[in-house]
Amino acid sequence: METMIKSYIKKGKDAVLNTPEIERKVRDATSNDKWGPSGTQMQEISRASYNYECFPIIMGVIWKRINDPGKFWRHVYKSLLLIDYLVRNGSPQVIRDCRHHTMEIKTLVEFQYIEEEKDVGLSVRERAKQVIDLLQDDQRIKEERDKAKTNQNKYVGIGNDSRDFGYGGGSYGGGGYDSDSYGSNQRDSYGGNQRDSYGGNQRDSYGGNQRETTRRDSFNGRDEGYGNNNNNNNNNSYDSDPYSNTRAEYENYSNRAETRRNNEFGDDSNNSYNNNNNFNNNNNNNNSYNNSNNSNNSNNNNNNNNYNNSNNNSNNIQNNPNAASGGRSRPRAASGSGPSPATPNFQSSQQQQQPTLIDFSEPTPANKPMVFDPLADLASGMNNTNNNNNNNNNNSNSFGGFQSVNNNQNSFNFNNNNQQQQQQNNFLQLTQSNPQQSNNNNNNNNFFNQQPQQAQQFGQFQNSSMNKDPFAKDEFGDFAGANGNADFNPFDQQSGDFSNKNDGQQKPKDTNDPWSKKDLFDLSNLGNQNPNQSPVNNTNNNNNGNTRSQPARVANGPITSAGSTIPTMRPQPMMNQGFNGGMMNQGMGGFNQGGGMNNMNGMNQGGMNNMNGMNQGGMNQGGMGGFNQGGMNNMGGMNQGGMNNMGGMNNMGGMNSMNGMNQGGMGFNQSGANRNTNSMGSAGRF
């Protein structure tokens, strides 16, 4: 009762899991029941091992059973029995797979399990040793497999005629095992009931049951089948006239079809095929004559073949009109009445009518070089140029060309020399193209509203023109043109405006300029003329009529706000000029040679140019505020130290109290300035 319940549970589980049938058979053969696997189960499994689909399922279940724990020792033992049977009777691939798992089998040699005070593991250990010994001996495996085939042949003759080539009952089956070694078993494995379905009924339609009997008897080495009258009749049926005639008709049909295809494509080898057809037909007729057929039938067949050959030849003549000339005709269209193939002239005319693709192989017209400067002023950099050379492009834009075809459009060509004034602010151009400068904005007091001049280019050191304005013309570090500025007075200009030189015109007076209401001190009168005259109140009439104080100057070099000169590339012997107001004496030589205004980042490096002084916004910021903030502020502030607040140099401590100048820009010249206080006092008392 318990066994039935377990069997029902197994069936229900297999139905739910859709377990293959061969897997259920292997599980049943290696179950935990107290009885071993039956011969029928092992036989079915051995036959299924030849099937490539069933083989992995069989071996998978076996290796899973072998690795079960000790309480399922029956699974292990029955798996070893099944392996031993499959090595002897199953597929040769079982042997290779078992050798791959030799280590798993060797572990069973030490298998131990005690059940009900009995060492049930002993049977497992002994069986594992036997399987290992069998797998390691190839000669023994071959002998065992031959012996198994011999034992199977003993059961073949029993009920052989009654089963009519059927693998029925519990016997080992029909005569499949009687054939070659290793190969017959494989046919039997795929055979069984399947071979009956393919060989029994279907083969009977061609040769009948007698054919199978003859084949089986020939395999068994018996000649009884050939001695029977029925077998003789059946043998005649294999080579009988109807079969040979049918085959001849089939060959004739195939030859006619081949000839028809050759005729359609104009092959010249039709005669050879026809001759072969005659040869085949003659052979077929000879066979029919040997098989005791009437000569009339053979003659009729020959006549039919000749008729067929004549038809083939006629077909060749009809379908191959160019065969005599050796040419080949093209196959006709499917309709049979289509138009003739297009001639080469017609095809060429069609090709000429078809639109051609664009030919990119032609060389494109050369584009003019174009320079794009992103730093140029957009308001003035977009110059309207009338370029007549653009018409050479035939009003067609070349591929990749960025220059407009129209003559009146704005271009980005900044190298046009036709215009009088270019608004360039290029930091990369190191050569000056137009040395003549036009002063069109003479009355413009706003420094930032001035349009940049053509020659104001950063980094240009090759200016050879003798310009009188060092700040509007000379570039950064360009002191070669400072010799011709003898008539230039920086304090004659308004705040930040150095573009207007002495051009002979009277400059309008700006009431908002704080420097227009007062006069600067004049250092040119120090130690000269009237010692009692204050340099602040000293008035000199300029050529333009404006009252301005003339600062001290030297013959060579531009005048600075401090009264000294900016030395040119050639050092000036300023120390030997005499005792001119104390500023040029040997005691104050630190101003020139000590690096105060030149080397110590004074007017040129620190004040005017680098610190955005007079040229770039220094003096434009609120009158002398630029001097204090950007220019002379590094010197400690001349406004705060002495000149402005002290009211000039009337007081005795004028130059002595210029601590800002000594401590700021002339930091290391404190001793020099202080040391010269006496000379300043003696020379500058007025």
Swiss-Prot record:
Phylogenetic classification of the source organism? Eukaryota, Amoebozoa, Evosea, Eumycetozoa, Dictyostelia
Entry domain remark:
The ENTH domain coordinates with the clathrin-binding C-terminal domain to allow a dynamic interaction of epsin with coated pits.
Subcellular localization, as worded in the UniProt entry: Membrane, Clathrin-coated pit
Instruction: Write out the entry's keywords from A to Z.
Output: Coated pit, Membrane
| GO-annotated molecular function | clathrin binding; phosphatidylinositol-4,5-bisphosphate binding; phospholipid binding
Its annotated function is as follows: Binds to membranes enriched in phosphatidylinositol 4,5-bisphosphate (PtdIns(4,5)P2).
Name the source organism. Dictyostelium discoideum
Q: Please give the family membership noted in the entry.
A: Belongs to the epsin family.
Q: Where does this protein have compositionally biased stretches of type Low complexity?
A: 269-340, 383-417, 527-547
Which stretches are tagged as biased composition: Polar residues?
185-211, 237-256, 491-503, 558-567
Q: What is this protein called?
A: Epsin
Q: What is its main location?
A: membrane
Which part of the chain is the ENTH domain? 14-145
One GO BP annotation of this record? protein localization to plasma membrane
Where is the stretch described as Disordered?
Answer: 177-417, 463-571
Q: One GO CC annotation, please?
A: contractile vacuole
Listed SUPFAM superfamilies = ENTH/VHS domain (SSF48464)
> What spans are recorded as compositionally biased (Basic and acidic residues)?
212-225, 504-521
> Which domain of life does the UniProt lineage start with?
Eukaryota
